[in-house]
Design a protein with these regions (language model features):
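Bacterial N-terminal signal peptides
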Residues: 11-21
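Mature catalytic domains of secreted/periplasmic carbohydrate-active enzymes
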Residues: 27-402
């Protein structure tokens, strides 16, 4: 694509945003601006310089917009435990819920309205081009049929269905690329998963397993993390992204072994930077947007509400205007937006979130040419390209470059 065409298309998208939202100044719904690269580097380390590109990322870089899904036992609690509040997916940590009680909570997990085909259809209506679904979050509960650990949706709940498997199949039927999230270094169900936060015991299960010094990450890695990743690769052949989190105590050798294993079973699969130790194919700033262009491929993961998992009291979702502004801002800097929804305990998406995303989808139906398949100009944030009489295109106003 010629750079001037990219600039014109982004100008048309910006004009459409004025019609959609009414106000010219950017609004970000509480998303932090300008700290993306720094934040990602502090948590996970920058990608190693000079490492050749491992896989073809063009489809992902053309997509620019994906759906992130967080669902687990925390969904049932909905941000409240025995009258006390707790932050969505962190309800177990916030309230120090014992493992035994979480296993009882699994008996209440029964999202009978779950329809994988409708989830994929909703993403398509929203203009999203790929889906990443949580397969295991920090509570250690697997959303797929895991032979190596019975604490999973098929064996431990009355629902008894493989949510990852059904969603993977629906994505394949509808031509939607599919990826899975996996919490690599944090597991509150496992006695060997130590804290990977700055302070000892900071985000590990120190109420059931108080002796941090007795915990051995390599035992957990060999017993659960590596076997479950292998299960995902073998059971769901259309996985195209493995989206790790909390690499924590992963050694360089363990991170590399994980990458080698994925490459063996799924050669084209993309891997994010949270596999740890400066490895991976793209960086993943969280709840932030880059302050400028980045030489590494990058993707901002951002919630549409206040938390990653479903919360009963979360009724304020980012408006269509804010989502569209975030998307165009990110695309103008060469990134992707992975927008998160927390499905309800019944297996549906919150109605207000769906309505807002449908509106963004309609906007993309008209303006998608300015988003999909684009690449950034040498600088971002230019104003409209000026058209001269006779059809000749004039240069942008240098005073209007941010």
């Amino acid at each position: 694509m010629k750079p001037i065409m990219m600039m014109r298309k982004m100008g048309l998208a910006a004009m459409a945003l004025l019609l959609l939202g009414g106000n010219a100044p950017a609004q970000t719904g509480g998303v932090r601006q300008g700290a993306a690269q720094k934040d990602a580097a502090q948590q996970y380390g920058p990608l190693r310089p000079g490492v050749p590109q491992r896989v073809d990322m063009q489809w992902w870089q053309d997509s620019h917009y994906g759906l992130f899904l967080h669902m687990g036992l925390y969904t049932v609690a909905g941000g409240e435990w025995k009258g006390k509040g707790g932050f969505g997916e962190f309800i177990q940590l916030n309230n120090k819920i014992p493992v035994a009680e979480m296993r009882e909570e699994a008996k209440r997990f029964n999202p009978v309205q779950f329809d994988a085909n409708e989830w994929v259809a909703a993403a398509r209506r929203a203009g999203m081009k790929y889906i990443v679904m949580g397969s295991k979050h920090h509570e250690g509960f697997a959303m797929f049929d895991s032979p190596c650990n019975d604490f999973n949706v098929v064996k431990a709940t009355p629902f008894g269905r493989d949510i990852i498997g059904e969603l993977a199949a629906a994505c394949q039927r509808q031509g939607m690329p599919f990826g899975v999230y996996y919490s690599l270094g944090r597991d509150w169900d496992d006695p060997d998963c130590p804290s990977n936060w700055p302070r000892e015991g900071g985000r590990s299960n120190d109420w059931d397993y108080p002796n941090e010094r007795a915990k051995e990450f390599s035992r957990y890695f060999e017993r659960k993390a590596m076997p479950q990743v292998l299960e995902l690769l073998r059971q769901y052949p259309n996985i195209s992204i493995l989206w790790f989190d909390t690499p924590g105590y992963c050694s360089p050798e363990q991170s590399q072994r994980m990458i080698d294993t994925i490459q063996k079973y799924r050669p084209g699969c993309l891997i994010n930077d949270r596999v740890g130790n400066g490895l991976g194919d793209f960086i993943t700033p969280e709840q932030t947007v880059s302050g400028g262009l980045d030489p590494d491929p990058w993707e901002s993961c951002i919630t549409i509400g206040s938390s990653w998992g479903y919360t009963k009291r979360d009724t304020v979702f980012k408006s269509p205007e804010i989502v569209a502004r975030l998307l165009t801002d990110i695309v103008s800097k060469g990134g992707n937006l992975l927008l998160n929804i927390g499905p309800t305990p019944w297996g549906t998406f919150p109605e207000k979130a769906v309505a807002n995303l449908d509106a963004v989808g309609r906007w993309l139906g008209t303006n998608g040419e300015a988003v999909y398949g684009t690449r950034p100009w040498r600088v971002y944030g230019e104003s409209f390209v000026r058209e001269k009489i006779g059809g000749k295109t004039g240069a942008e106003n240098p005073d209007e470059v941010k």
